[in-house]
Amino acid sequence: MNIHEYQAKALLKSYGAPVAEGVAIFSADEAEAAAKKLPGPLYVVKSQIHAGGRGKGKFKELGPDAKGGVRLAKSVDEVVANAKDMLGNTLVTKQTGPAGKQVNRLYIEDGADIDRELYLSILVDRSVGQVAFVVSTEGGMDIEAVAEHTPEKIVTVAIDPEKGVTAENLKTLADALKLEGEARADAEKLFPILYKAFVEKDMSLLEVNPLIVMTNGRMRVLDAKVSFDGNALFRHEDVVALRDTTEEDDKEIEASKYDLAYVALDGNIGCMVNGAGLAMATMDIIKLYGAEPANFLDVGGGASKEKVTQAFKIITADPAVKGILVNIFGGIMKCDVIAEGVLAAVKEVGLKVPLVVRLEGTNVELGKKIINESGLNVISADDLDDAAQKIVAAVKGA
C-alpha cells in the first residue's frame, strides 16, 4: 500500500526525522491560509499523486510550456495562483503513463536553501535476507539512471536484524555520502530513526530522494515515498486509515475485497491463474507468442467457485480485454471447482471474447469433462504452450 508524500513526512516526523513545515490542502480556497502558516518567504507547491517524476511532469490541460507538478513560489499570491493552476488537472509523469493522474490535493511546504542533494532508501534486500540502506551522492534524480550509468556511485549496506544500525553501519553510510560536520551528526541520528520507522511500520520501501544538506550545514528530508507490506496491514490500523483509494485502480480495489491478488496491466489478454509463479510464467509465455497480458491475477490455492466467478467478473470489466486465458494447476484447488466457477461466470457476464482454459492436477479429467459438455464456446488446451498459442491466435483473429 502506498501513501502520499505529506502523509509519509508526517509519519517520519513522528519518529523524529527532520522535515520541513507543510500543510496539505484539498481546494484552492485553502491555499492562502496554508501558506500563511509557514515561515516563508520561499514556498514549494507539490502535487500529491502516487507517482514519481512530478517535478518534470506536465499537466494535460495546461499545454507543453506550463510548469510541472512541483513548483517554487516566492509569495503567498504565487502559492494561490499555482494552487488554482494545478488542482483538478491531470498530471502526466514517466510513472503515470499517458493517462496521467488527477491532482486532488497539494502539499504547501516551506522552502529550503539546498547545498547538496543525496539519495537514500531502505528496502528488503532479498539477496541477503536483510533490510538494507541504499545510498548515493547522486540525489534528486532518477536513481535507475545512476544504477545503469554509474553504479559505483550507489552503496548498499545490509543491517543485521539482531544488532540494528551499528556504529560501523553509520560510519559506512556517512562516508559513502561524503558527510562532514553537522550534516554527518544529523545523518548519524537520522539513519536509526528511519530504520526504526521502516521495521515498526512493516514498510516495504522507504525512499528519500532527495535527502538534502542545506546551506546552513543541516540535513532535511526533502521528499519521501513510503510503501507498506500489504500482508502486515492487519496490525496497523493507523496506516490503513491513510489509504487513498482514488489513487488505485478500481479493479484492484474490487479484487482486494475478495482476497484476490490483481494488478492491472496494459495488454489485451486477461489472465486468471493460481499461484504467483505460475501467473508470471503465464504472462511470460503470452509475451513470447507476441501478445501482452492485461493483468496479473492470482486466485490463490484454495479459491471457491464464488471466488473464481468474482475473479472472472473483474477481468471482463476491463474493456481492453479481447481474450482470456485461465491456467490452473489443481493441488489444493480442484479442477472441477474451477471449471464450474468459470462456466458460472461465463453465463453470468455473457462473455463475448475468446476464452481458453488449461487445467492440470486434481480432478483434471472431471474438470475438462464439465467444460467440454457445457455447450459454451470455451476452448480447451492440453498444456501451457498450447493454451498460449490458442489464446493469442484467437485474439489476433478476432
Swiss-Prot record:
Keyword Nucleotide-binding annotated: yes
Cofactor remark: Binds 1 Mg(2+) ion per subunit.
UniProt cross-references to InterPro entries, sorted A to Z: ATP-grasp (IPR011761), ATP-grasp_succ-CoA_synth-type (IPR013650), ATP_grasp_subdomain_1 (IPR013815), Succ-CoA_synthase_bsu_CS (IPR017866), SUCC_ACL_C (IPR005811), Succ_CoA_ligase-like_bsu (IPR005809), Succinyl-CoA_synth-like (IPR016102)
Pathway: Carbohydrate metabolism; tricarboxylic acid cycle; succinate from succinyl-CoA (ligase route): step 1/1
Binding site for Mg(2+): N209, D223
Binding site for ATP: K46, G53, R54, G55, E109, A112, E117
Gene Ontology annotations for the cellular component aspect, listed alphabetically: cytosol; succinate-CoA ligase complex
GO biological process: succinyl-CoA metabolic process; tricarboxylic acid cycle
Cofactors: Mg(2+)
GO molecular-function terms, A-Z: ATP binding; magnesium ion binding; succinate-CoA ligase (ADP-forming) activity; succinate-CoA ligase (GDP-forming) activity
Keywords for the protein's UniProt record, in alphabetical order: ATP-binding, Ligase, Magnesium, Metal-binding, Nucleotide-binding, Tricarboxylic acid cycle
Family, per entry: Belongs to the succinate/malate CoA ligase beta subunit family.
Function: Succinyl-CoA synthetase functions in the citric acid cycle (TCA), coupling the hydrolysis of succinyl-CoA to the synthesis of either ATP or GTP and thus represents the only step of substrate-level phosphorylation in the TCA. The beta subunit provides nucleotide specificity of the enzyme and binds the substrate succinate, while the binding sites for coenzyme A and phosphate are found in the alpha subunit.
Protein name: Succinate--CoA ligase [ADP-forming] subunit beta
Protein's organism: Rhizobium meliloti (strain 1021) (Ensifer meliloti)
Gene behind this protein: sucC
